[in-house]
Amino acid sequence: MVEVPSFRSNEHFPQLCDKVTVKWDKKRGRFVEAIEDIPIGTVVCVETGITVNVDPQNCYRCLKITENASFAYCKNCEEFYEPDEIACGEFDELGIFKLAAHLVFSYPFADIASLVQSSDPEPPSCAPKALSTQDIEAIFQLTPFPEIGEAFKAPAIQNAIKRIVESLETDENWGRLDQISRTMTFTKALRIMAERSAKNAHTIYSIEQIESQEDNLPMATGLFPISSIFNHSCTPNISGFFVRNTFIFVSQGVRAREELLDSYGVTYHQHTFEQRTNFLASVSGFICHCESCFKMKSLKVLEKPKKYPETIATNASCFTDITSYTENIPRGSKELENLIIAFARRPDSETYTELIFQFWKKFVENAKFRGITYDPYLVRPYVEMTILAWNKEVGCENEEKMSLLIVTHRLLRNCYVDLHPLSELVVKLVNVVANQNADEINRTLEKLKLRARMLWKYSEQSEDL
């Protein structure tokens, strides 16, 4: 489990912080409510989920990078029992059923066996008094998606069930059941887990993958039953990120008696109403009725993107082409930010140190005009400006340098609890700047620049402007 020293656990809901409680009503079902004001940067949830790898270089169970990619588990997880066929990826093509099978083996056999003798668990109709990820009841309280039951008729699923049940014959618990009972028990347990995973499971990307903005293979999929209590809003007041198999949420500023609301992948300030509606319907299976969708719909500057900024940035023959194009982009349009990111990936952009510094300033001003004032989205431009601020060609005054560094440090601390890949170096830079050690400042800046370039996948192919 990832350690978060600042986290203060709730007595009744150990994965949630002590500033919240869980409630229920007919409209929202279960929801998380603040019992007092929760300042920006406060950790509100730390949940180690039940996960299975997608990328084979990650441990099947905890998602650490394995020393040997041909072995499914890391050293700490190799004692975990589960049929080897699942852990070694033989059922990867079955998607959510791989996670569902893993869930069956993640809880005590007695809890799983009792499912055969009882009716299917019903979604809750009241607020729980206590709940933990370690309790199978946390899984049962998730809203099921019964339609997935049809998939059990597929030959591939039936064959997988048969193989797994046969492999359990020598298990000290499952082996006590005869073949028919073992098949019935496993099949029902698998179905219940699959129904609750279908619309509640998360696809897991690391911070590095999110920052690189590339279509990488996800690390894993997983179920986080406590985190799943957070409802969606297109204007959320919490934000979350993954560190291996741990889901961490931080407050973006929540008032007492307000509901804590997450974004399920789309927001009012970054996506049009149509984009949000289509995404939530296809991925999460619901229509959003938050205030942004019900009243405000879309920001006009997001409605009509012009061209592909990546193509413009790549094909520009001179810097004037870029600057003249930006002058025609409407204020607040995300197109400007995408153009700056695309242009910054060109190694030759560093030839224009002062101008690219001003570009990142425009990025922040443009995002703020759209309503993005304190958000993980602003980490990159502030890190880029901090690195450039100490460049002599930029000519920043000490006051501006310190201001940029402080904002960068606070963003990383308040949005990522200093668990961002660049956090350690930014903290070090704050310390060496305070000590006024010029040589150490330069060395730290070079390390920060190198790590940032690796994180944001700068192009290695240079084109002359």
Swiss-Prot record:
Q: Name one GO biological process term.
A: methylation
Cite a single GO MF annotation: methyltransferase activity
- Listed EC numbers: 2.1.1.-
Q: What family does this chain come from, according to its entry?
A: Belongs to the class V-like SAM-binding methyltransferase superfamily.
User: Any idea which UniProt keywords this protein has?
Assistant: Methyltransferase, S-adenosyl-L-methionine, Transferase
Tell me the superkingdom of the source.
Eukaryota
Stored Pfam families: SET
Q: Which PANTHER family match?
A: SET AND MYND DOMAIN-CONTAINING PROTEIN 4 (PTHR46165), SET AND MYND DOMAIN-CONTAINING PROTEIN 4-LIKE PROTEIN (PTHR46165:SF6)
* Gene coding for it: set-3
UniProt enzyme class: transferase
The protein's name: SET domain-containing protein 3
Q: Where is the SET domain?
A: 18-265
Say yes or no: keyword ATP-binding present. Answer: no
Respond yes or no to whether keyword Methyltransferase is given for this record.
yes
